[in-house]
């Protein structure tokens, strides 16, 4: 392997190795995704992670502007009628914010925390049939879009900027720390920051996901966690941390930033209590057994991963045939 380190951000899209391209992990033709543009406007999957904030902020401005004329708008207050019907007091509110509700939406948060700056106001748009009950809404740093028929349960903490699609369930205990794009039909409970989860992604248990991408129908088992910063890098002051380096096809690539979690291709799964190192790439249909520690690098597609018992640092890798499991499922 050459000693030269290539800066990923300096490469044109056509010069990016296949293992770092979006099409290696996500089949948007088979599984269309509303925010596919995030990947089209960046040169690599890691470039997409870096672009989440900017993309989400711009998309929110555009879509909320389009929806404004058809929604009921409340500035620095929450609509009173739902709280009155329940016999409860109004939500606690602080600062400047804006609520846009479509007919049939229910907005009964516990707290709404807006900007303390007089010249700054972010918005939350709640589509028809969506329900937000007992959640803590933080609009200090960005706006929010909550898609139709999505439910956000009591006890959820959610910070903007964030986009949540249609028919998604955000369960009690979830902590969404901002810069999140979550697709349609997802189930969410753990802690998420700066990540994109595509349609039908399942993150339904106490877990952590940061600086990551999760494709169509990916799944996290209970307590599965993605480390996004090396354990020794955590001992270094943030300004002095070095960028993460990934080895790919005999070359070393400087990602430009010290943090990255996991890139999970369509249908990939992490078993219960599995941990991935910063900079782990799982191609489609890659499945990790429970209690595995997955070192950074590239795995799959169509592969099963597990740690070898009683041996240090060994990952067993076996072929996986998706068509077999699908046929088996059809017979049950």
Model-derived features: where do they sit?
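Terminal amphipathic alpha-helical/low-complexity segments used for targeting or macromolecular assembly
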Residues: 1-129, 285, 291, 300-332
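Short, mixed-charge, low-aromatic patches
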Residues: 3-9, 123-126, 143, 173-176, ...
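Short, solvent-exposed beta-strand edge segments and adjacent coil->beta transition regions
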Residues: 34, 107, 132-134, 153, ...
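Short, charge-rich amphipathic segments
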Residues: 43, 142-156, 240-241, 245, ...
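Ordered hydrophobic segments in well-structured contexts
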Residues: 125, 146, 154, 263, ...
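Extracellular beta-strand solenoid repeats
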Residues: 125, 131-133, 138, 145, ...
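Short loop/turn microsegments at loop-to-beta-strand junctions
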Residues: 141-142, 160, 209, 259
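Glycine-rich hexapeptide-repeat left-handed beta-helix
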Residues: 190-192, 196-332
